[in-house]
A protein has these predicted regions:
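Walker A/P-loop
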Residues: 23-42
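Conserved pre-motif I regulatory segment
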Residues: 1-26
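Walker B catalytic acidic pair
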Residues: 109-110
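Residues immediately C-terminal
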Residues: 113
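Conserved Walker A/P-loop ATP-binding site and its immediately adjacent core
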Residues: 53-70
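Inter-Walker segment of RecA-like/P-loop motor cores
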Residues: 72-97
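Post-DEXD/H (motif II) to motif III coupling segment of the RecA-like Helicase ATP-binding lobe
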Residues: 116-168
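Conserved small/polar residues in nucleotide/adenosyl-binding loops
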Residues: 186-193
Length: 197
């Protein structure tokens, strides 16, 4: 069982439980690579130790569902005991009417997708359930916010702060103009590259 949180993850967990005393629906923002899934599993485990009896964790891709299932399992929670269900939003949308239990907590991984109608139904159908949205990007390209779904946002350190403290590696950002020669070279494998595959 892996229960060790980094100091910033522990701080985020404490801030979340304090925020839940005031709000039912909270979004947590942490940059990519800082352990959101590990934190998610620790939060779920602590929630189940308290008043919660059922948790649904919802993601938008099968690969994320598998990653979360593995992490939750490493934290000592198995899907066999029925208290934690990890599922894709597509599966939940098709099967929700056949599910007889109601969740005490709904966790949305990659919560920047939560404005989609398939997610909004979770707020309508399970208003008493606490909600936790986990994301690296608490904004959408269309400019819409999340205040109609999440009552509060808990933001972690910035990427620069994580790099400065040694938790993330520095990086170089390269922008390639669309339809440029560089873009075509990057997106089109050479005959030599295709022979190696």
């Amino acid at each position: 069982m892996n229960d060790t949180l980094r100091d910033y993850q522990q701080e985020m967990k404490l801030r979340l439980f304090k925020e839940w005393e005031l709000h039912r629906s909270v979004m947590v923002q942490m940059p990519t690579g800082t352990g959101k899934t590990h934190l998610l599993a620790a939060i779920v485990r602590e929630f189940l130790r308290g008043s919660g009896s059922r948790v649904w964790i919802v993601a938008h891709r099968r690969e994320l569902v598998e990653q979360i299932e593995e992490t939750v399992s490493r934290h000592g929670m198995s899907k066999e005991d029925g208290r934690v269900r990890v599922m894709s939003i597509q599966w939940l949308s098709r099967n929700r009417k056949h599910m007889d239990e109601e969740p005490d907590l709904i966790v949305i991984d990659e919560a920047h997708h939560a404005l989609a109608e398939t997610y909004r139904i979770l707020w309508e159908n399970y208003p008493e359930a606490r909600k936790l949205g986990m994301t690296a990007t608490p904004c959408r390209l269309n400019g819409k916010g999340f205040t109609d779904l999440f009552d509060s946002l808990i933001a972690s350190w910035t990427v620069a702060e994580f790099i400065g403290k040694g938790w993330l590696s520095s990086f170089d950002y390269v922008s390639i103009r669309a339809n440029s020669r560089d873009c075509l070279l990057y997106t089109s494998p050479s005959p030599r590259d295709t022979e190696r595959s």
